[in-house]
Amino acid sequence: MLQTQELQINIGPQHPSTHGVFRMIVTVDGETIIDLKPVFGYLHRNHEQLAEVSTYIQSMPYTDRLDYFNSMANNHALALAVEKLAGISVPQRAEYIRVLMVELTRILNHASAVGFLLNDMGAWQTPLMFGMREREKILDLFEMASGARMMCNYFRFGGVWRDLPPEFIPQLKELMQGLPSFFDEFERLLRENEILLSRTVNVGILPKEVAVSYSVTGPVLRASGIPYDVRRAEPYSVYGDLDFDIPIGSVGDVYDRFLIRIEEMRQSYRILQQVIERLPDTTGGHINPAMANIGKQKALRPPPGDAYARIESPKGELGFYLVSDGSERPYRYKVRAPSFINLTPLGDMCRGHKVADVVVILGSIDIVMGEVDR
């Protein structure tokens, strides 16, 4: 009688498709996956402990290095937590500038994520190059505003580092003229490719009940059919005054996660249009009076207490929990990283599929190991 034997194979920690040092222990029967266990920690850098021995503002550059694609969003989440803890208000103009930067970040992230996944799937470099083209234009805007293309360190407690330079909005408008055609072109490349459809439709399905049980958030959750978005569930900044839709999927497979990200780029475009229209009517302001004595005391000292702030980052719900003992350093600093939590159902999503599908399913989650391991 013919018998088969289960085999354990390792994918990673050094593997081009994991986009970082990440290991998967895969148990297979032939080519079919029976079990998959993700192994994290190879990029652990002690982020939270470093923040607990640093002043509050010294932690801001560290957040840039959590998810290096989304440094503006990371800055935003920490700024909200400290402002909540210290009772700091933010001028309306700074709020709109923050939203503008985060939505540009969302377009940058999703264009890169979809492009990288297509490239991993089989050398489809054309969509990747299209995504990189738009990403470069957005990075030019970031450099114009903050002086850095990636690790921007642009947000401050009570606002942003500086106002937008005069040439920023004209260059942003020029970028936005080409975005609708880019979205359509990007989507057409996906929908009309038979190979891509065969690799993504009904692959890596994450049922909504399983997604909720794992506390998944972001595009991965919405692709499973749950319309949860922190910008709507608990509006922060000026999102409560902006008009945008929350796209959701119906199946929760890799293909749905593709389409959700493309539609979210369109919604970010809508938000940017509204922000550009309202910015001329806003005024900036000086740093909040609550921070007036910081120069004398050398560092911000929030009153004793705790605060949790969360945002809808491009990868999901990003949260910062801070505990203050009244000193210039946080007593406790905790990060809720969406990449880490969204990665936990990977085994359930891969079970029953082929080994070749692991790369596709992992890429559709969109993780950055700096945020996973911290």
From Swiss-Prot:
Cystine pairs: none
The keyword Transport is annotated on this UniProt entry: yes
Enzyme class, spelled out: translocase
EC annotation from Swiss-Prot or TrEMBL: 7.1.1.-
Reactions mediated catalytically: a quinone + NADH + 5 H(+)(in) = a quinol + NAD(+) + 4 H(+)(out)
Key word NAD present: yes
Localization terms from the record: Cell membrane
Main localization, broad class: membrane
Keywords tagged on the record: Cell membrane, Membrane, NAD, Quinone, Translocase, Transport, Ubiquinone
GO cellular component labels: plasma membrane
Pfam families: Complex1_49kDa
Membrane topology summary: Peripheral membrane protein
Molecular function terms, GO-annotated: NAD binding; NADH:ubiquinone reductase (non-electrogenic) activity; quinone binding
HAMAP family: NDH1_NuoD
Role of this protein: NDH-1 shuttles electrons from NADH, via FMN and iron-sulfur (Fe-S) centers, to quinones in the respiratory chain. The immediate electron acceptor for the enzyme in this species is believed to be ubiquinone. Couples the redox reaction to proton translocation (for every two electrons transferred, four hydrogen ions are translocated across the cytoplasmic membrane), and thus conserves the redox energy in a proton gradient.
UniProt family annotation: Belongs to the complex I 49 kDa subunit family.
Oligomer status and interactors: NDH-1 is composed of 14 different subunits. Subunits NuoB, C, D, E, F, and G constitute the peripheral sector of the complex.
Name used for this protein in its record: NADH-quinone oxidoreductase subunit D 2
Biological classification of the source: Bacteria, Bacillati, Chloroflexota, Chloroflexia, Chloroflexales
